[in-house]
């Protein structure tokens, strides 16, 4: 069978078209991920700037003001400085554990953002077990911290890693029990379903009013998970120099710095999703699109409003951990463990039993 030149050109053009479709498919698949990473990076820079400005206001001093207007580029300048610093590795430590520890901490926190809905079904992965996926993934981060402390071959680093692991285990259980109580109220483990379950009664439908005890326990546990004051024992400067970060410099130290703020942002986002109604606005906004001549059928305006509401609630809530840093003194290690095991765990367990009983009685 003889194939002429025209048929060969047709086959080649068809194969090129299929290759282009594959390339476009890969780009379209990576676009949401890259957009989320870019948004998270900008969000972390905003948190750093807010913390410095709020801290300066609390201490009645002037915050950063030279790096860009109002000092908004100060965090970017600090990151550039860390990138240009020398990356030192301890000669007597475990090089592999020392190098892989920061990466595990950052990647595990980054994966948590994949189940957070920023708008109406605007989520990277709408999993049916979204909240438990977050708990499972976030529990990997302390493993990276422990590896960093052990791989540094430094007593201060090792003690900091052990403290981080003990603290995470102590407060992960009350956190999970509070999340389970919310899931029982919403009859779902999906983050999207939990937000939609709070949209029935507007402001009064938030889980904050139905789970006030769980909200307080969740707030304390999330502060401990983020290692924020008064729970920053793994890196207490007066006791452990810098904890598991003592031997780190350059980009690896910058990864730990980013991981702490990534964890703070993801905790605040989950507070918004689980307790503050997510993307739902508490006041009617049905007539706003018609007022400005915007067609709501395209859902563009509604999506932008949802993203704005979610981020506004998140950054308003961030004022609490930032203000707490300059308000409360650091706990001792025995006080921290007693608070987690003797108080928060029984309270969260009792809250779960009450929630289960109320749900059974309502059947």
UniProtKB/Swiss-Prot annotation:
This is NAD(P)H-quinone oxidoreductase subunit 1, chloroplastic. Belongs to the complex I subunit 1 family. It catalyses: a plastoquinone + NADH + (n+1) H(+)(in) = a plastoquinol + NAD(+) + n H(+)(out); a plastoquinone + NADPH + (n+1) H(+)(in) = a plastoquinol + NADP(+) + n H(+)(out). One of its GO terms (molecular function) is NADH dehydrogenase activity. One of its GO terms (biological process) is aerobic respiration. It is an enzyme of class 7 (translocase). PANTHER family: NADH DEHYDROGENASE SUBUNIT 1, NADH-UBIQUINONE OXIDOREDUCTASE CHAIN 1. It comes from Nicotiana sylvestris. It comes from the Eukaryota. It is a multi-pass membrane protein. The chain crosses the membrane at residues 30-50, 98-118, 127-147, 165-185, 203-223, 248-268, 300-320, 336-356.
